[in-house]
């Protein structure tokens, strides 16, 4: 049995949860790293936030600490994002991130798109004749905090298939703290490719103050082509 993201999305459409927006900043010139920003307005407090993340694509791991700015004064979201960008600039320079160098945008399924499969996605790399397939698998996991809140939680496995060969991009052994207390559903949103480097952005759904919240999880991987 797996957690059902569509039901979470249906609740999100009916209730005022906190659905973050995504800003893909770009890849480094060699494609080894990339950076992205997630931003929005917190449910409950109504204050803006902006968080920058830096990914080592070859290792599918964080390249360095994230940068987060949360408003406490009632400033505009634009002002909060500007402060976060300024704070993130040293890391963007350190990792050689080129703003706007987003490569080829191969797939886009925003949260408003209800006509696609949540856990599978097929796309084609420009120089490869065969398609790739991403498949998400969710494994319900017991968590004392989530059980006390009567909220679901799920571990994530992500498989990538190409030319009949499957490889694992992500396999959770435990719930990462970076996803919040109770990540209860996952969904493919965007896929980018640059210099044979893959960047996949997933929606991660958790229970929020006023309804389901959504944040982003990014996966990176070097690609093989035929």
Language-model segments: residues:
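Exposed acidic/polar residues on beta-strands and adjacent loops within beta-sheet cores, strongest
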Residues: 1-226
């Amino acid at each position: 049995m797996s957690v059902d993201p569509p039901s979470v999305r249906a609740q999100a459409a009916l209730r005022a949860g906190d659905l973050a927006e995504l800003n893909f900043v770009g890849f480094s010139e060699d494609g080894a790293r990339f950076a992205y920003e997630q931003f929005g307005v917190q449910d409950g407090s109504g204050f803006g936030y902006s968080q920058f993340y830096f990914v080592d694509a070859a290792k599918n791991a964080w390249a360095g600490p994230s940068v987060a700015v949360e408003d406490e004064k009632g400033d505009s979201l634009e002002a909060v994002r500007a402060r976060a960008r300024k704070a993130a600039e040293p890391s963007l320079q350190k990792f050689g991130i080129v703003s706007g160098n987003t490569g080829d945008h191969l797939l886009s399924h925003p949260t408003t798109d209800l006509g696609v499969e949540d856990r599978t996605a097929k796309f084609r790399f420009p120089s490869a004749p065969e398609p790739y397939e991403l498949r998400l698998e969710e494994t319900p996991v017991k968590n004392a905090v989530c059980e006390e809140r009567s909220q679901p939680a799920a571990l994530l496995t992500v498989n990538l298939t190409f030319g009949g060969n499957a490889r694992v991009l992500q396999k959770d052994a435990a719930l990462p703290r970076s996803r919040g207390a109770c990540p209860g559903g996952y969904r493919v949103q965007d896929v980018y490719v640059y210099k044979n480097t893959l960047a996949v952005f997933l929606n991660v759904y958790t229970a929020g103050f006023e309804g389901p919240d959504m944040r982003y999880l990014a996966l990176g991987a070097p690609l093989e082509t035929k």
